[in-house]
Amino acid sequence: MLPSLIQPCSWILLLLLVNSSLLWKNVASFPMCAMRNGRCFMSFEDTFELAGSLSHNISIEVSELFTEFEKHYSNVSGLRDKSPMRCNTSFLPTPENKEQARLTHYSALLKSGAMILDAWESPLDDLVSELSTIKNVPDIIISKATDIKKKINAVRNGVNALMSTMLQNGDEEKKNPAWFLQSDNEDARIHSLYGMISCLDNDFKKVDIYLNVLKCYMLKIDNC
């Protein structure tokens, strides 16, 4: 049965605090939480509406980061090789597109989003760390990657909080795959970072789909 109670949502405050200086579009249009006994309360419906909007903004920013990285390092031999790329999340049993997501039970869809977000917890740290070691990398790329990492971590905390609140087995053991970037060859590291950002782009498009399908489910929106 789908929960409909008003729940304390301190993680929503975390999302807003993390991004308050980053000018999220349309955040002001979302309903704010009600304060009771010093605690913030928000309905699940409002929570998913906000999460859906934030995830969509992050997805756009990750795509922009990928485009900027690809453009800046376009002269690196073989960078745009279209051969299949195996991502650190390839083994995860998650819906591949919106059609599959719509056919997935809300609890399984929420778990799928959590699995992808958890799988990127450590690789995001590696991504930001490795970018700073590449010669002539533009400051804007490092800045965007750092920004994205903070926002994704905030969404991950939020989704995991929803998992704990809505699902009885929300605290099940997590299996987070590693991503190895070690190499003395600069071009090889650029290739690896390119592949990593490409995978992040694809994965966060999935997260965006999942959270917005869940939003439609919670708000009972037919044409979404």
Swiss-Prot record:
What are the recorded Gene Ontology BP terms?
blood vessel endothelial cell migration; cell projection organization; myoblast differentiation; negative regulation of myoblast differentiation; neuroblast proliferation; positive regulation of angiogenesis; positive regulation of blood vessel endothelial cell migration; positive regulation of cell projection organization
CDD domains annotated for this entry?
Answer: prolactin_like (cd10288)
Q: Which cysteines in this chain are paired by disulphide bridges?
A: 33-40, 87-199, 216-224
> Entry's InterPro entries?
4_helix_cytokine-like_core, Somatotropin/Prolactin, Somatotropin_CS
Main localisation, per the record?
secreted
Q: How does the record describe the protein's post-translational processing?
A: N-glycosylated and sialylated.
PROSITE patterns in UniProt: SOMATOTROPIN_1, SOMATOTROPIN_2
Print the keywords alphabetically.
Disulfide bond, Endoplasmic reticulum, Glycoprotein, Hormone, Secreted, Signal
Q: Name one Pfam family in it.
A: Hormone_1
Glycosylated positions are: 19, 57, 75, 88
Compartmental location: Secreted; Endoplasmic reticulum
Tissue specificity = Expressed in brain and cerebellum. Expressed in placenta and hair follicles, with highest expression levels detected in the outer root sheath and no expression detected in bulb. Also expressed in body fluids such as plasma and amniotic fluid. Expressed in embryonic fibroblasts and at low levels in keratinocytes. Isoform 1: Expressed in brain and Neuro-2a cells. Isoform 2: Expressed in brain.
Q: Does the keyword NAD apply?
A: no
Signal peptide residues are 1-29
Q: What GO MF terms are annotated?
A: growth factor activity; hormone activity
Entry GO CC: endoplasmic reticulum; extracellular space
Function comment: May have a role in embryonic development. It is likely to provide a growth stimulus to target cells in maternal and fetal tissues during the development of the embryo at mid-gestation. May play a role during wound healing and in the hair follicle cycle as a growth factor and/or an angiogenesis factor. May play a role in microvilli formation and cell proliferation of neuroblastoma cells.
Q: Family, per the entry? A: Belongs to the somatotropin/prolactin family.
Name assigned to this protein: Prolactin-2C2
Can you name the source organism? Mus musculus
